[in-house]
């Protein structure tokens, strides 16, 4: 069920350069949300008609709260960084398909996140509730690493080599000799392409969350379409979780 709800900001803090963490109190959306889904936040500036899609980092279903971790990338997200406790914000959600947690039950699961694709892996790790392998890739400065370390077996890669393995998440997989039965991943296309190739090579099912520019967030406007081998070229699949080696032509 997707609803538009006026919510209240509980707290917000900067956790890395240009990266912000916000807890939002909701009456309905938190109870319906699943790991890997996202919400759309609406601007109060009338000149910005389209909402901004942001993935869910943590979901407190009993407490009716959502945590988002986002990068300031333009005027819309810059507006959100000024929100403080007690401010109201309109959100639409939950949107997209959550990761198929049942596919990981009783298996060795590796979660792989790159850049701003890192945050949704946190709730995914919590919902799996097992000793999950977590690979996080950063450009330089780390964020959420303490939370991930508490949620599973954390492995880090940084492009500048300042922490963990120098390189990307696939470099960490190879250098740390990591193995898994199932992979869940979210991040930029080059990373997902490398994970797809790895999954094909090893025969590992890979479920991916794609990052695409979008407008409506519900698949009606076709702004987020991606080519697929299983559906026509105009079917919306972004932020839908797909088996990478069976479905995506562009990866």
Region roles according to the model:
Residues 2-85:
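Ferredoxin-reductase
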Residues 212-230, 236-239:
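Local cysteine-cluster metal-coordination motifs and their immediate loop/turn environment
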Residues 240-247:
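Conserved small/polar residues in nucleotide/adenosyl-binding loops
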